[in-house]
From Swiss-Prot:
Span list, region Interaction with PCNA: 341-349
Entry PTM: Phosphorylated. Phosphorylation upon DNA damage induces relocalization to the nuclear plasma.
Similarity comment: family membership: Belongs to the XPG/RAD2 endonuclease family. FEN1 subfamily.
Segments for region (I-domain): 123-254
Gene: FEN1
Residues given in the record as Mg(2+) 1 binding sites: D34, D87, E159, E161
Stored InterPro entries: 5-3_exonuclease_C_sf, Flap_endonuc, HhH2, PIN-like_dom_sf, XPG-I_dom, XPG/Rad2, XPG_CS, XPG_DNA_repair_N
Function statement: Structure-specific nuclease with 5'-flap endonuclease and 5'-3' exonuclease activities involved in DNA replication and repair. During DNA replication, cleaves the 5'-overhanging flap structure that is generated by displacement synthesis when DNA polymerase encounters the 5'-end of a downstream Okazaki fragment. It enters the flap from the 5'-end and then tracks to cleave the flap base, leaving a nick for ligation. Also involved in the long patch base excision repair (LP-BER) pathway, by cleaving within the apurinic/apyrimidinic (AP) site-terminated flap.
Top-level taxon: Eukaryota
HAMAP family referenced in this protein's UniProt entry, alphabetically: Fen
Region (N-domain): 1-105
Biased amino acid composition, Basic residues: 361-379
Binding residue positions for DNA: R47, R71, E159, G232, D234
Name of the featured protein: Flap endonuclease 1
Length: 379
């Protein structure tokens, strides 16, 4: 889910932190990608014309493998080096959100069954997408595919977004890529969104620069995290009735969640907002400030040449993909990863010193002219 309303709030109050560009603008970059979010996207988006997920002859879902294979090739063809990060065990505090998702999924399954005989294809697809979840088996299949492709992946001990941010902070990669806005709470220098969307959607890539967000909002890290918790995150419920506008106003007025809670608790007659009983906002704050991650210095990322015959065995013989397409994709991978991705030009040039203003130039010219006249007079 991420943080409710954060994307729009940043666009409104910190527009200088936002950039939009095309995939080609990221050439030469290494990027840590939230794999679990990607697989979820692929299971929803990669479908047959009738709306069903891709399957092989045995009826096994293969949408996630198709998406991972072809979107990764697209990144490599644009001289981008991806590293995928998989979720580990979720924090205990996230249990409530996961339970809500399970209930929503079960309700969607019931709705889908109710309209099975009389509903339209569009209705069926809509409810079908709501039932999607990434299984452990699908995660393992994606990891096996990445190994054969020669693309590195990291198993995060906990949240994938936090590990992506750690790799970016530690200089292993340029940016963290995820659709979850709570990624920005873990301090990646840059957050990229829409990176693995299909070309057909024609969505530009969003880049959010963390330091510029804090600077524009005039907040330190802790205050920004408090804002995100107040907006609504996966770790705890928020204060009922508090939307983005009110949350921003309260944080600006009081400076922290502790003071907001104190004010609302001590002044029930001045506000309609009620703090949830035993609200674990402080525990949520600690999870954002000190997430469970592997230190970037301990992670060794290595991109290798793809195992073409291994890909044929796995993707064609076991999963039912077209051999011609897999071989063609493997050749593109081979070409893209051969010898490493080309470095960016901005790494070879230093900034040009700011030119002197015209007044300085004029003074120099006047001085030079005066010296010239004096020399002629002496002759």
């Amino acid at each position: 889910m991420g943080v409710k309303g954060l994307n729009q709030l940043i666009k409104e109050h910190a527009p200088e932190a936002f950039k939009e560009f095309q995939l080609k603008n990221l050439f030469g970059r290494k990027i840590a990608i939230d794999a679990s979010m990607c697989l979820y996207q692929f299971l929803i988006a990669v479908r047959q014309a009738e709306g069903q997920q891709l399957t092989n002859d045995e009826g096994e879902t293969t949408s996630h493998l198709s998406g991972m294979f072809y979107r990764t090739i697209r990144l490599v063809e644009n001289s981008i080096k991806p590293v995928y990060v998989f979720d580990g065990k979720p924090p205990v505090l996230k249990g409530g959100e996961l339970e809500k998702r399970l209930l929503r999924r079960e309700e969607a399954i019931k709705q889908r069954e109710n309209i099975k005989d009389e509903g339209t294809i569009e209705d069926m697809v809509r409810y079908e997408k709501r039932t999607v979840r990434v299984t452990r088996e699908q995660n393992d299949e994606a990891k096996k595919l990445l190994e054969l492709m020669g693309v590195p992946y990291v198993n995060a001990p906990c949240e994938a977004e936090a590990q992506c941010a750690e790799l970016a902070r530690g200089g292993k990669v340029f940016a963290a890529a995820s659709e979850d806005m709570d990624t920005i709470c873990y301090q990646p220098p840059f957050l990229l969104r829409h990176l693995t969307f299909s070309e057909a959607r024609k969505m530009p890539i969003d880049q959010i620069q963390y330091e510029k967000v804090l600077e524009a909002l005039e907040m330190d890290r802790e205050t920004f995290i408090d804002l995100c918790i107040l907006l609504g995150c996966d770790y705890c419920e928020t204060i009922r009735g508090v939307g983005p506008v009110t949350a921003f106003k309260l944080i600006k007025e009081h400076g922290s969640l502790d003071k907001i809670v104190e004010y609302l608790t001590n002044n029930p007659d001045k506000t309609n907002f009620k703090v949830p009983e035993d609200w674990p906002y402080d525990e949520a704050r600690k999870l954002f400030i000190n997430p469970d991650t592997i230190d970037a210095s301990e992670v060794n990322l290595k991109w290798k040449e793809p195992d073409v015959e291994g890909l044929i065995q796995y993707m064609v013989k076991e999963k039912g993909f077209s051999e011609d397409r897999i071989r063609s994709g493997a050749e593109k991978l081979k070409k893209g990863l051969k010898g490493g991705v080309q470095g960016r030009l901005d790494g070879f040039f230093q900034s040009v010193p700011k030119p002197k203003d015209s007044a300085d130039k004029k003074r120099k010219n006047d001085t030079k002219s005066a010296k010239s006249k004096k020399a002629k007079t002496r002759k």
